[in-house]
Amino acid sequence: MGKITFYEDRGFQGRHYECSTDHSNLQPYFSRCNSVRVDSGCWMLYEQPNFTGCQYFLRRGDYPDYQQWMGFSDSVRSCRLIPHAGSHRIRLYEREDYRGQMVEFTEDCPSLQDRFHFNEIYSLNVLEGCWVLYEMTNYRGRQYLLRPGEYRRYHDWGAMNARVGSLRRVMDFY
């Protein structure tokens, strides 16, 4: 079970809301979010309701302002607790519909360019565990939560383009 607390002001000040489950619409609980404390679990925050918009991956820890989670603004409108999995496996493809060169990962990868020799992924298949895909190397840029399943095109995971720089397993549950 996870626990996250959202604060309207920086430095864990102002009105706050404590959460332990997925929420598709946080707007009734606070108008802005400038700091977050994750007591347990791994969470994906979304800028828009219904798990849409920019995504931000947070694990246990304190985030005294939204820049700490690489946020572009103080807008957090939905959140999802990411389930813990024991093993992780993902396949990435250079073309849509699982065509072209394929590479499989079971560990984090800070630079797809170094391992895969290109930085555009058009389809993927998450076989085990949850992953976070990052637009840039070294776990920077836009983030996308990938749960087990098939993603035939980059639009399926919410991306505007096929650029992928790095990927990380979701592991820190406690």
UniProtKB/Swiss-Prot annotation:
Molecular function terms, GO-annotated: structural constituent of eye lens
Pfam families with a match to the protein in the record: Crystall (PF00030)
Location of the region described as Connecting peptide in the Swiss-Prot/TrEMBL record: 84-87
Keywords of the record: Eye lens protein, Repeat
Tissue occurrence: Detected in the superior olivary complex and fibers of the ventral aoustic stria of the auditory hindbrain.
PROSITE patterns: CRYSTALLIN_BETA_GAMMA
Entry GO CC: cytoplasm; nucleus
Highest taxon, organism lineage: Eukaryota
Residues annotated as domain Beta/gamma crystallin 'Greek key': 2-40, 41-83, 88-128, 129-171
UniProt keyword NAD, yes or no: no
Note: There are six different gamma crystallins identified in rat lens.
Swiss-Prot/TrEMBL domain comment: Has a two-domain beta-structure, folded into four very similar Greek key motifs.
Family of the protein in this entry: Belongs to the beta/gamma-crystallin family.
PANTHER family in UniProt: BETA/GAMMA CRYSTALLIN, GAMMA-CRYSTALLIN D
Record function comment: Crystallins are the dominant structural components of the vertebrate eye lens.
Protein's name according to its UniProt entry: Gamma-crystallin D
Organism annotation: Rattus norvegicus
Gene it is expressed from: Crygd
